[in-house]
Design a protein with these regions (language model features):
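Conserved, structured core segments of small domains
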Residues: 1-118
Length: 118
């Protein structure tokens, strides 16, 4: 079954960009992604630009409204995702607990609906 890991953290949480700690964490991300791939469970994963690069679209009264930034102010921002294919929720949760920023952020795990199954 496929599961989406939605990776959240507070803006500014974690190591400072460019620091030795940041470089070390990036190596953890690369190793984690490689481990998912080597285990044959990685479908896809990407980092996202920050909320300052986001645009929200709402359609109201037949017209599209575009707003810079996310729809609502949030304490934690979505920073990326992984899509994995594993047998059980327990397997997904075990992999999610290993996401490098799980120690200062949060990982939301959601099963993906498979409409091809009828």
């Amino acid at each position: 079954m496929q599961y989406m890991f939605l990776i959240y953290s507070e803006p500014g949480a974690g190591p400072e960009m460019g620091s030795d700690e940041h470089q070390a964490e990036m190596q953890q991300w690369f190793a984690y992604t490689a481990a998912l791939g080597e285990a044959g469970v990685l479908v896809r994963g990407d980092a996202l630009h920050g909320t300052e690069a986001a645009t929200t679209v709402r359609v109201r009264d037949g017209g599209a409204l575009h707003t810079d930034g996310p729809f609502a102010e949030t304490k934690e921002a979505l920073g990326g995702y992984y899509l994995v294919d594993v047998p059980t929720l327990d397997d997904a949760l075990a992999w999610a607990a290993k996401v490098p920023n799980a120690g200062y952020g949060s990982i939301e795990v959601r099963p993906v609906v498979d409409f091809s199954q009828g």
